[in-house]
Amino acid sequence: MFYSAAVAALMVGSASAFLAPAQFNSVAKSSGALSMKLGSSAEGLIGSDLELPEFDPLGFTNNPAPGALEWYRAAELKHGRVAMLAALGQLVQSFYHLPDPVFSESAKPWQALVKVCNERPLAAVQIGLAIFACEAIGQANQAKPGQAAGDLGWDPLNLRGSNEEIFERAQLRELKNGRLAMIAITAMIVQENLTGYGVIEAYRENAINPFGDGKGFF
């Protein structure tokens, strides 16, 4: 089925998200995207000292290899940013579609993606190429000397400004929203596959109680 091939292509296109952490060995610590004071633990790393300080049940920060923490943070930021776009897209597509029947016949986001991949294979190829281009450009920027983890050198709105304290708060908001979005988009996909309802569709059909109403999973 074309959908399986398309998913495989998209995975290859985003493979640089999992490049070995050794690439960060030569990257000097800077405050470009994260004010990090890293040693052999996450102490001082933005986002590691709130709610559950030093929360690391899997031990990623226990004597990591050189450059590993930067790699972990870059991967976390990348996935968080993608998840924020994905979660927003799940909601937007319930209200707006491109003027093509293949985009507008399903209210279920995941089902719509499968339909697009099967009926508009070139659209899936375009998605894959766009992902590859973003990864290649981002990787080139990330590899610059002195570039901090997650700093892609792209700030068209000049959000960084000149106040480091304000910028660190903005970084923390991005990190926490990204973490929440990763949980949210996972829950949205699970909900759709278990109940048959997308997020907005569930509210429209009053299918918001998962227990005993004949519409939820239980």
From Swiss-Prot:
One cellular component (GO) term of this entry: chloroplast thylakoid membrane
Species annotation: Chattonella marina var. antiqua
Transit peptide: 1-36
Keywords for this protein: Chlorophyll, Chloroplast, Chromophore, Membrane, Photosynthesis, Plastid, Thylakoid, Transit peptide
Subunit description: The LHC complex of chromophytic algae is composed of fucoxanthin, chlorophyll A and C bound non-covalently by fucoxanthin chlorophyll proteins (FCPs). The ratio of pigments in this LHC is; fucoxanthin: chlorophyll C: chlorophyll A; (0.6-1): (0.1-0.3): (1).
Biological process terms in GO annotation: photosynthesis, light harvesting
Protein's UniProt name: Fucoxanthin-chlorophyll a-c binding protein, chloroplastic
Family named by the database record: Belongs to the fucoxanthin chlorophyll protein family.
A GO MF label: chlorophyll binding
Main location: plastid
Pfam families (alphabetical): Chloroa_b-bind
Cited PANTHER family: CHLOROPHYLL A/B BINDING PROTEIN
Domain of life: Eukaryota
Stated role: The light-harvesting complex (LHC) functions as a light receptor, it captures and delivers excitation energy to photosystems with which it is closely associated. Energy is transferred from the carotenoid and chlorophyll C (or B) to chlorophyll A and the photosynthetic reaction centers where it is used to synthesize ATP and reducing power.
Record localization: Plastid, Chloroplast thylakoid membrane
